[in-house]
Amino acid sequence: VKIGAGENEFSLGGETVLFRHEKTYVSKTRYAVSLCSCMDDAAIDAKLAEIPKVDYERIGERMFAELVYVNYAADTDKDRYVEIVKKAAALNRTLILGCKDVELAKAALEVCKEAKPVLNGADASNYAEMSAVATEAGVVLGVTGKDLNELYDTVAALEKAGNKNLILDVGTASIKEAYGNAVQIRRAAVKDQDRTFGYPTLVNVAALAHGDRVMQQALLSMFTMKYGSIVVVETLDYAEALPLFGLRQNVFTDPQKPMKVEPGIYALNGADENSLCLTTVDFALTYFVVSGELERSGVPCNLIISDAGGLSVLTAWAAGKLSSTSVAKYIQENVEDKVKCRKLVIPGKVAVLKGDLEAKLPGWEIIVAPLEAVQLVKFLKDLTA
């Protein structure tokens, strides 16, 4: 299922296994920050101002809250709800409209349907009307039920009517029930090959643990690992996001493939052929940590990445993938004719290679770097002073 439009389009679902190690997970969990029509304008504006503050890069991947959930609380001003949706749409995030009122849903979609939001509001009592509204606007419909049986019957009825553009809301009765539903839905779809439950799921932890930020963080982690395609939370500040996005990135990498970057010469800080050369392995985490520190130093340098099978420095050295022979060969074949500088900085953890490299690379000065990447900034500034 695809939601959103343009740069904010995301794929959900498509999973074929219950556990990551069986093959791999396909579509990563997306996080939504919730707004509600029961909140006053100041609180809504404050929350909308906070959302863009969490936006950073980790190992080459952008980390930010991709979605905004706008909930309609019963007996609140309907026109104001549409205004809140309009405000949220201006944030350039994909929206989820939590609304069971058919006419209000229609009005809210009018102000944001181009961005392909999710309309989360179908249940056993209104699914036909809600489906018509969602289909007309060309958006994904969120379906819920008081229990799994009702949810199953509602989804079956929607499929029969021709709407297969759905997301399943696991419910907010209790944490235990929501977790059980998420697991049962995935098991039915993957293990029992039941297509009726073969849709992405939405978990609203903002409703499950309202007002309890610590519990919401715990639930965010749990539903990232256990089958939430979209997880809705009340707040997501920088301190809460760091461990959460790190967890998600680990869960949704492919265990069949090492995380590696392409071998080559990476010019940093406007480096040219006369700039200092440093070398390390092609393990993605090593590359991004080292390149980040090098950029922070502001010293122009060429970072040379050779093929070490996607292993970290010590692992590659122990496995024979990082040796004086492999480094010297790579420098001679791919680097020597492209740079004029003859100073090469090697990782501190393989200082033992210094002597061999000096013998195999005549004319090169081999320099040993510090043991930790965090020490590189001072090291480089002292070296080039």
Question: Where in the sequence are the language-model features?
Answer:
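Extended, highly charged clamp/arch subdomains and adjacent linkers
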Residues: 22
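Conserved mixed alpha/beta catalytic, RNA-binding, or beta-rich assembly cores of soluble enzyme
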Residues: 4-5, 10-19, 29-337, 341, ...
